[in-house]
Amino acid sequence: MDTETLCLITADSGKVYGILKAIFGDESEIVKKLIDFDVSIRVVPLNLGLLNIFRDNAADLDNADLMKRRFGNTMGSRIVEAYRRSQDSKYKRNVCKTTGLLVCLFGGGLGLSREADKHKKFVEGKSHNILSVEMLKRALSIGGQNVDANKISSFWFATYTIFTTVYSPRLRYQAGSSKRIIALSESRNQYRSNLFWDLRDDSSHEVMSMVHVLSALFASALTAYISTRVRHELTQGNDERESLNNVLVWLKTLTFEPSTIALIAYIWLVSPTDAQATITIGSVMESESSDDFPDIVKILSYTSNTMLPVQLLEDGRTAYCSVADGYTRHTTALTLITDYNSSHMSDKFGVLINIVKFEHAYALHYVHHKPRDGKEMTITSPSSEMMFTSVVVTPLSSYPLIHARNAVIDWLRTFVHMFPDSGSLVIPADSYTWIHNLAQDMFPWVQLSTTLDIRDDHYFQVLCDCLSLGRDSRNHAKVEKLIKYMKASVYNFTSEARGNMLLAITVYK
């Protein structure tokens, strides 16, 4: 998904370049030049909850009493004010003359509009009001602006799924006394956390809170990285205006997968400083050689007290680090090799559970389960007739067998967002490719595991059917039926709803 669809690209003051001081030094003439120029680019994530509110209440947005009853006085007033501004022909966007971007002075200062004091009163301290108008225009397709809220919802739920399955478990070892990180690491549990909204009645609110956290981390990281790109442009002999506009053109060409955003958010969250996080993100996104890979792998690796030294494969183009966690080995690798899913890599590291693709490099996460003392390990799996059978588990088949059930639930929760809330299920033809690509990003291990002797496992077979939606007419009707059944439960993910979903998956035929 491209940057403009995921975010609002706005103009801010020179205070955004403050992070460059920590990276390049306070005395850097180029950094001082940028701060004095006082124009920067800031990425602001779309508030998915607000987008859905605008869309779901489109007919009542001018009804102040009704909006206040539904969303409280503060939010209700904000919604109505945004709607009335969007309809006011006299309402003018404050636009940066240098970049043509919407002005939002999150960083304070007056550099973007120093020639007119009236803009100070309009912008400073009221950025949220301006952003609300812009998001409303997108949600209601006003002035040619539009977003596909269904696809954006699915995209962010996919990001949430990847983050909580791949990265959250690592945070248990890094939490220390930080309640914030502990809450992130346990985001799938059914309990309240100070990090998330207090007024939630089910875990759908918890998911939305996590989406807010992830989108904020991503936006902060991308804004900082953009600043380093502007500085680089300036070192190439361009003036400030050219540098900003060159970076803006580049920024609008960027596309992101959910796995990329999850990794960037993780780096921003766990790095000791914002400056170090920015350097790491830049190194991963721009690397054309493996020279920096060992240092980056240390940051990306699964964290525990048994981390092994970073090693290089014989070719020198792949750096990796393995971590033993009980009877499970987690391996994180950075490679320039495009054939990353080769049997050689799987035999060495285990099941490839996550792939993050950058321009030149690939970040890979593997899991290898080792049966205790070499004994044969079995798990109990239901068949479609609800007769339970024992399945022999090998190191390579263990991850697919253990995680297939939850993966089916995550797939359904992700893609139900794309379909109408009522009426018949109609999937647009162009959505099949979108669904397939997003699912491959979430579950790369499914395709790589189909060669194993586990296709008779019921949950794994259901997951394979879901991932082949639209490609196999025999399975299409069954998956469609499952999606329809899930609609009532997917937004109310209580214990009862989860039980209903598990029952539906178990009896899936």
Swiss-Prot record:
Its main location: host cell. Keywords: Host cell junction, Host cytoplasm. It is found in: Host cell junction, Host plasmodesma; Host cytoplasm. Transmembrane segments: none annotated. The keyword Signal does not apply. GO terms for cellular component: host cell cytoplasm; host cell plasmodesma. Transports viral genome to neighboring plant cells directly through plasmosdesmata, without any budding. The movement protein allows efficient cell to cell propagation, by bypassing the host cell wall barrier. This is Movement protein. It comes from Rice dwarf virus (isolate Fujian). The lineage of its organism: Viruses, Riboviria, Orthornavirae, Duplornaviricota, Resentoviricetes.
